[in-house]
Amino acid sequence: MDFTKPETVLNLQNIRDELVRMEDSIIFKFIERSHFATCPSVYEANHPGLEIPNFKGSFLDWALSNLEIAHSRIRRFESPDETPFFPDKIQKSFLPSINYPQILAPYAPEVNYNDKIKKVYIEKIIPLISKRDGDDKNNFGSVATRDIECLQSLSRRIHFGKFVAEAKFQSDIPLYTKLIKSKDVEGIMKNITNSAVEEKILERLTKKAEVYGVDPTNESGERRITPEYLVKIYKEIVIPITKEVEVEYLLRRLEE
């Protein structure tokens, strides 16, 4: 997939192939996070002992926002498939702009679900993938680092729904124009949903978790991530939020 060539990006098969590759990345990021405790203090704003000068927020927010500032300076967020968690902190790069062609509608950056992704990650995903409950102050930095990797992978996967939505819109402009004009959210949701594809995703994730989630050379080794939890995360979080992204993007598609 080449973002300088829109025809490769809006090809549904290319999009599906990219989403499959993202599965591997997300699984491995989850496995890395699974070595640590839940560490709730990392997510608590202004937690005693984790106060940060001139910053109001959690240790994770501080680490993530500062990383995004650095990444913005090297053009990360110029790429159409990257969505920042702190868009108001993004800085202009000193590198020459790549000048990607317009692939998505101009309002696409405004379709940003990262606040929701971060909230559901902390509240629902962390308890499923962590080694145990509780804090481990010696590993706060490592935990935040792994969390950022997980969040960025989830964000990219979920916001790829904008490319899915644009490709589907282009594939049947009359149908989607009618649905958008009538603000038929249910109709849009019905047309973007492919239950057979979703079922294949869950089946594939089950197999991947069975293979990746345990060390095959250690028969007594603990399973680092279970197929049940991985399927639950995709079925109840990743897929539904991706479809929310698609619907919001499509509802605005006829804007001038």
UniProtKB/Swiss-Prot annotation:
L-tryptophan binds at residues 138-139, 141-142. This is Chorismate mutase. Homodimer. Catalyzes the Claisen rearrangement of chorismate to prephenate. Acts at the first branch point in the aromatic amino acid pathway where it steers biosynthesis towards phenylalanine and tyrosine, and away from tryptophan. The gene is ARO7. GO terms for biological process: aromatic amino acid family biosynthetic process; chorismate metabolic process; L-phenylalanine biosynthetic process; tyrosine biosynthetic process. NCBIfam families: CM_pl-yst. Gene3D superfamilies: Chorismate mutase, AroQ class superfamily, eukaryotic. Its EC number is 5.4.99.5. Induction: Not affected by altering tryptophan or tyrosine levels. InterPro entries: Chorismate_II_sf, Chorismate_mutase_AroQ_euk, CM_AroQ_sf_eucaryotic, CM_II_prokaryot. Keywords: Allosteric enzyme, Amino-acid biosynthesis, Aromatic amino acid biosynthesis, Cytoplasm, Isomerase, Phenylalanine biosynthesis, Tyrosine biosynthesis. It holds the Pfam family CM_2. The lineage of its organism: Eukaryota, Fungi, Dikarya, Ascomycota, Saccharomycotina. Optimum pH isin the absence of effectors. Optimum pH is 7 in the presence of tryptophan. Optimum pH is 5 in the presence of tyrosine. Each dimer has two allosteric binding sites that can bind the regulatory effectors tryptophan or tyrosine. Can bind either one tryptophan or one tyrosine, two tryptophan or two tyrosine or one tryptophan and one tyrosine, which differentially affect the catalytic activity. Activated by tryptophan and subject to feedback inhibition by tyrosine. In the presence of both tryptophan and tyrosine, the enzyme is in the activated state. Residues 3-255 form the Chorismate mutase domain. One of its GO terms (cellular component) is nucleus. It catalyses: chorismate = prephenate. GO terms for molecular function: chorismate mutase activity; L-tyrosine binding; tryptophan binding.
